[in-house]
């Protein structure tokens, strides 16, 4: 299984599938179809029924091999890679039996070391796939793709392993927040699903942030600075004032666990007009709503000083905490917990300080927790995958399929 995972991840990683946040098409880049078409071919070679729609959502079915009816389970992974770093000409490297010492990344001056990345201590002795330092690896989420494909291959080649109906989806544009936007839950036709899009060994995630994005637009009055007294309103100064009125400790670099934050992503402008872009995050719905209200209150406080209401706030919700929906169907979490226990894996159920496709899918009627893939340091040249942990992820997929096929009278 290890060699199959290495081969799959390497082949998939070498295909450039970077998504583009500035594109309005779906998928946002045509090159994502290169991997989707390859996966369609590989799925059909396994004998699975497949279909891919115009938006690049590839669905496949492995039919049940048992007589009794059990829930249909889905497994999902996204094919696109992050736009935060170079994703072309990816050259995966293999490190056997990682000894814990610093690893130079190709001919660059970059290196993987445990002082900077202490989580690497947990993968000592493992086989790692890393980059050559010039690109990201794309294990987010091609490791998940490889794990699902490897598990399907095993089930096809081992019919003695009993399972119900399994649905698989490989999707575009997760990295730009649009993964589920055109996902047809009805067409997918599963009772619940799991995204294989987590990170470190043991992660079983069913709590995500509530998320919103806000654009603050400040309108100034620009006149000649020599005659500006009591006339000029500097939009940049308005933006600075707005940001200074937010709680200074409620920012990403000072929060953890269940603590939410305001994150100023971008600030640019001139005397005449300035814009600030924020993301707002909190696990608790009430605190989340209070954070959004805080932005509106600051707007109102500044606007009361001026006659022309120079500050505008445009805000929209991106996704909500999937725990609200997943907790309504506790078996969705109990199944993988039982599988983890059988496999000797201690589940890490800490909340995601982010979101997954499952965050949106759960509110679209498809409860979808997230499971580890064995990768870390996403979105940059320090990304790596533990092939050993990927093997365990495949075992989890197989275990879930078997667990669901068990009689329900236990």
UniProtKB/Swiss-Prot annotation:
It is found in: Cytoplasm. Zn(2+) 1 binds at residues 78, 140, 197. One of its GO terms (biological process) is peptide catabolic process. Its EC number is 3.4.11.4. The active site is at 80, 174 (proton acceptor). Zn(2+) 2 binds at residues 140, 175, 379. This is Peptidase T. One of its GO terms (molecular function) is zinc ion binding. Keywords: Aminopeptidase, Cytoplasm, Hydrolase, Metal-binding, Metalloprotease, Protease, Zinc. It comes from the Bacteria. The keyword Zinc-finger does not apply. Residues 11-30 are annotated as: Disordered. Transmembrane segments: none annotated. Cleaves the N-terminal amino acid of tripeptides. The gene is pepT. The keyword Signal does not apply. Its cofactor is Zn(2+). It comes from Staphylococcus carnosus (strain TM300). Binds 2 Zn(2+) ions per subunit. CDD domains: M20_peptT. Gene3D superfamilies: 3.30.70.360, Zn peptidases. One of its GO terms (cellular component) is cytosol. It catalyses: Release of the N-terminal residue from a tripeptide. HAMAP family: Aminopeptidase_M20. InterPro entries: ArgE/DapE_CS (IPR001261), Bact_exopeptidase_dim_dom (IPR036264), Peptidase_M20 (IPR002933), Peptidase_M20_dimer (IPR011650), Peptidase_M20B (IPR010161). Signal peptide: none annotated. Belongs to the peptidase M20B family.
